[in-house]
Amino acid sequence: MTPLIFVTGGVVSSLGKGIAAASLAAILEARGLKVTMMKLDPYINVDPGTMSPFQHGEVYVTDDGAETDLDLGHYERFVRTRLSRKNSVTTGRIYENVIRKERRGDYLGATVQVIPHITDEIRRCIDEATEGYDVALVEIGGTVGDIESLPFLEAIRQVRTERGPEKALFMHLTLVPYIGAAGELKTKPTQHSVKELRSIGIQPDVLLCRSEQAVPDSERRKIAQFTNVSERAVISVPDVDVLYRIPSGLHAQGLDEIVVNQLKLADKVGPVDLSMWEDAVDATLHPLDEVTIAVVGKYVDHQDAYKSVGEALKHGGLRQRTKVNLKWLEAQDLEGTDMAALADVDGILVPGGFGDRGFEGKVLTSKFAREQQVPYFGICYGMQAAVVDYARNVVGLEGANSTENDRQSPNPVIGLITEWRTATGDVEKRDDKSDLGGTMRLGLQEQRLKPGTLARELYGKDVVAERHRHRYEFNNRYRTQLEDAGLVIAGKSMDDTLVEVVELPRDAHPWFLACQAHPEFLSTPRDGHPLFIGFIRAARERKAGGKLLQEVRA
């Protein structure tokens, strides 16, 4: 039976439960434990795949093709465990499972209720996702007091009652606001949040107190007194200048020791090694170079929509001790302009997206990068924009477009995928009348790279695997025509049916590469990702006037 750490949040949302949980997981992993993580989301959607990026932020994709909450991206960037569909559960999925069982007759005619049927299904999902690990962290989305969260909170209360404190620990993240007019921190919101939690039968073992500044010992004692939590388990989590400081900050206050002692893990752990995180902090604070990258997207007003892209760019800089400044630009705003907003950047990245809004701005961005010799990295929709630009402006295919945006295009160089293999090798089919949810090409897919290409050089091997999330693809009818005009097809699916990577010859452009996959989902601060590292290096070389640079490793 895997020991569980349940992470809840109070007072307000967006306090950083996911980062806090991932930081603790990183410490426990650094002490030699096999760790996994899980997110329980209280919304009714089956998954976030069809949710607006403006509301929900990024949809993170796992190896097995699950469309999940962006917190799973935090988890995978902080710990080495590769997560799956089991690690992201929503209210919608829980109810879907229960209703399916009821229709099959699994409940033998019983009246199906929240307790015990919904809570039992939640507990079953927790057991399934956490089995076989030394310890698991389970984050409950939302805020204590939300009506949507009640079934999840009741389920974890039951787990604690049955397993006891040595197999289930409650960690509550709360806000300790600083009131500038009074010049002091206020603990009352935390007291009320814990009171709310205790009213439903959950007594926190650990409090993580989020604040603008460190919570002084006097306030920690006060919080401990009013919440029935040990003073040493009231942990201060102030704002930090570098995210990678958090594991060291939590370890310095003994959080991992509290967990190890309560969950009886002492015989499994060794001394902690946080050198990787310390090196990341040092490389971030003491860069040797600096570049500016334009990210031209559709949802830039809500930067969480491109969370993994932003992190992967920073990881690419981290491996070279280079500070990466991000210039977020709305693609639609570039349409009809002279593209002056891109004049001062060292590299351009065009990330994924859906729908016709802003697509022409992405095409113009690709054209600008191609003609002005600016390093260009296109991802998913960014690759499709690059192909459309090349077809229109180099090959001369009038009206070239994606059928996603123009079904009547005379030259549909990007079209709907009607058949493909899933991450497990099964054949999937769809048409333009299929449901939007769960009908894309999703998950980890292998691709073969062409010898002598930039992509092959960056990856350093012939066959690579990347995660995908798309339903439109390069139209093979135009493959030969575009190749004859100079476009390099650098990567294809293993069955040779889908174009995965395109680039320009290096004698025509210093660094122009676009891929259909989402390599940002496999980038971590430990290793970065070869495409992002190569892109940042190209941006550095452009800034240095084309001079080849010595690689500097963090």
UniProtKB/Swiss-Prot annotation:
Catalyzes the ATP-dependent amination of UTP to CTP with either L-glutamine or ammonia as the source of nitrogen. Regulates intracellular CTP levels through interactions with the four ribonucleotide triphosphates. CTPSs have evolved a hybrid strategy for distinguishing between UTP and CTP. The overlapping regions of the product feedback inhibitory and substrate sites recognize a common feature in both compounds, the triphosphate moiety. To differentiate isosteric substrate and product pyrimidine rings, an additional pocket far from the expected kinase/ligase catalytic site, specifically recognizes the cytosine and ribose portions of the product inhibitor. This is CTP synthase. ATP binds at residues 14-19, 71. NCBIfam families: PRK05380.1, PyrG. The keyword Membrane does not apply. Pathway: Pyrimidine metabolism; CTP biosynthesis via de novo pathway; CTP from UDP: step 2/2. Mg(2+) binds at residues 71, 139. Residues 1-265 are annotated as: Amidoligase domain. Keywords: ATP-binding, Glutamine amidotransferase, Ligase, Magnesium, Metal-binding, Nucleotide-binding, Pyrimidine biosynthesis. InterPro entries: Class_I_gatase-like, CTP_synthase, CTP_synthase_N, GATASE, GATase1_CTP_Synthase, P-loop_NTPase. It comes from the Bacteria. One of its GO terms (biological process) is 'de novo' CTP biosynthetic process.
